[in-house]
Amino acid sequence: MHRRLAVSARPARCLIPCLASLWLIAGLSPAHAAEPPAWPTTETAAEQAGRIPLWPGDGLAPGDHALAQPQRTLERSPDPALPDRFVDHVNRPYLVVQRPAHPNGAALLVIPGGGYARIVLDKEGSALVPSFVEQGGVTLFVLRYRLPGEGHADGADAPLADAQRALRLIRARANEWGVDPHRIGVMGFSAGGHLAASLGTRYDQTLHAPRDAIDRVPARPDFQLLVYPVIDMTGIATHAGSRQQLLGDAPRADRMQQYSPQQHVTAATPPTFLVHAQDDTVVPVENSLLFYGALRAAGVPVEMHLFPRGGHGFGIRGTVGLTAAAWPRLALAWIDAQREVSP
């Protein structure tokens, strides 16, 4: 009988090396599925109405320039009941807000994945609404961020600059949305998990001169949830596609270290909730294990749930019949428990 492995802040000396050894013995490596066909579509009317630009004026980030390729939204699913859209060439980053009828004061900056080559809109965005918004009462702010390989002036730091600005914007306008400014977390998936972990470890890094008062608001998340996250850029567990998009074809060793969030964990890193499937062959579970170990070493409160099956990119709707289906309920309970955690 398969059982879910839940790990809280307890010693786990052999967990990382043991699973890493199994990974090597099995001869597994990240898989890259063939790209499915895609065709043009649009964001929904509600998504368009819920847009919140990150930057004032022309909407461009400080020092950035307009891209030649306009933003586009593409659909990959032939089933209208199960959309699988993505967006790329984001030039003017923005949030899409999803507000509950009965907000509980908590908010999540949601950062979907896409290997830093695209941003998925549904399985790690709109599909979260029933569990987190309608049932959980959490206000979601889903980020459409700039991608690092599309020619932006700030290159690999473009996504982090957008994430910092998004967190600051939510906090600065918290009263407008019925949000407690001390209960704003970040939740990232896959490459979006790398960006969320980067925000949680590099929230105070200055990436550009402040443009306005919002840029002086603290960007530290009060807590972070990382779901099958890309973490390491240096070793066998690296997701090669995300690293190539972020750092190029042959990055220097110091650059790979700089963009590996486990290298930047401190005691001030926010409390963390980790979710991963042990059979993930795209982003190996060692990514979560490495981050868990770094958090434990720094004394950061951490809760980790490792499920036996689920593969990669399961989100919510890919967990039917699996023990991984429990993760949204566990996440909501953990978010509620953060009321008692001091920043």
Where are these regions (language model features)?
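Short beta-strand/loop motif that positions the catalytic acidic residue
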Residues: 274-276, 280
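Catalytic nucleophile-loop/oxyanion-hole region of alpha/beta-hydrolase
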Residues: 120-122, 127-128, 141-181, 318-325
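C-terminal catalytic histidine-bearing segment of alpha/beta-hydrolase fold enzymes
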Residues: 275, 285-343
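Active-site glycine-rich loops that stabilize anionic/oxyanionic intermediates
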Residues: 112-117, 278
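N-terminal cap/lid segment of alpha/beta-hydrolase-fold proteins
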Residues: 37-102
